[in-house]
Amino acid sequence: MDQAKGKVCVTGASGFLASWLVKRLLLEGYEVIGTVRDPGNEKKLAHLWKLEGAKERLRLVKADLMEEGSFDNAIMGCQGVFHTASPVLKPTSNPEEEILRPAIEGTLNVLRSCRKNPSLKRVVLTSSSSTVRIRDDFDPKIPLDESIWTSVELCKRFQVWYALSKTLAEQAAWKFSEENGIDLVTVLPSFLVGPSLPPDLCSTASDVLGLLKGETEKFQWHGQMGYVHIDDVARTHIVVFEHEAAQGRYICSSNVISLEELVSFLSARYPSLPIPKRFEKLNRLHYDFDTSKIQSLGLKFKSLEEMFDDCIASLVEQGYLSTVLP
């Protein structure tokens, strides 16, 4: 990539990960065009305007994932596009129409706008490690790498709609990019933990808050899970954009641990919090991730301690938790 910092677009800029990515890009000296549903919503976007460099180098524009052409203006003239936006998942009786189609079409609509932009150098798509790990035929002793894809049939059978939507959307993105000569790189983060910039907690941050308050409902399904600091994921997006040799998929995950190990760690580190002690044992295959590909580009992952220390400090600052004593 050109060493001079240029203009880039971040879709869904007000989201949990996207906000942190915008923060990182501004600190790196990029001019950032962020797409949002409603640029006039001052309350929802105030956290973006507070970022260092925002007044000089951030512009927010309206775009709708389900409207073809609505990203044209935001993307035109940008050297890079970071597509982090994805449809909001809600309980549904029609996952095909309300989860799968929006995820695929939303991604393709962004790529259709990218195709029209002669300045484009690279698109970085936020996918998910769930596009790799949902299989029933892998060897638990061999870490999962980027060559592996989640089983579509397994997702449908067990109604794992989020993983299926991410898998189908990423596969559609690869097909479209190959057919249209778009330089695409995908980032596959595991479960994000860390400070939250938006005023309202996303489902991920809300799940962590629930666990720290003693709730078991959301985390009981985690079983074996990869965790990663939000800053590592944002930095990964920038690293794979800037490294000319970067190509293909990049798993982005620090620790893969069991739920029992997680709550044991949390209870020991934050004894003043009512961390649940017991969860129902899930019969799931052990797995680990091979992250040598992204580490070969120089990325070093933050520790589990840093993830949760930063997350808890943010939750305290925002008033979701009272002061946590070590």
From Swiss-Prot:
Compartments, as annotated in UniProt: Cytoplasm; Nucleus; Endoplasmic reticulum
Function: Involved in the biosynthesis of hydroxylated tetraketide compounds that serve as sporopollenin precursors (the main constituents of exine). Is essential for pollen wall development. Acts on tetraketide alpha-pyrones and reduces the carbonyl function on the tetraketide alkyl chain to a secondary alcohol function.
Designated name of the protein: Tetraketide alpha-pyrone reductase 1
Record-listed E.C. numbers: 1.1.1.-
Family: Belongs to the NAD(P)-dependent epimerase/dehydratase family. Dihydroflavonol-4-reductase subfamily.
Organism expressing this protein natively: Arabidopsis thaliana
SUPFAM superfamilies: NAD(P)-binding Rossmann-fold domains
Entry-linked CDD domains: FR_SDR_e
Any single GO CC term annotated in Swiss-Prot or TrEMBL for this entry: endoplasmic reticulum
Tissue: Specifically expressed in anther tapetal cells during microspores development.
InterPro entries linked to this entry: Epimerase_deHydtase, NAD(P)-bd_dom_sf, NAD(P)_dehydrat-like
Effect of gene knockout: Male sterility due to distorted pollen grains lacking reticulate exine pattern.
Any one GO biological process: sporopollenin biosynthetic process
Annotated NADP(+) binding sites: 8-32, 44, 162
MF terms (GO), sorted A to Z: oxidoreductase activity
Name of one Pfam family that matches: Epimerase
Alphabetical list of Gene3D superfamilies matching this protein: NAD(P)-binding Rossmann-like Domain
Subunit structure, as described in the record: Interacts with 4CLL1/ACOS5, PKSA and PKSB.
UniProt KW keywords: Cytoplasm, Endoplasmic reticulum, NADP, Nucleus, Oxidoreductase
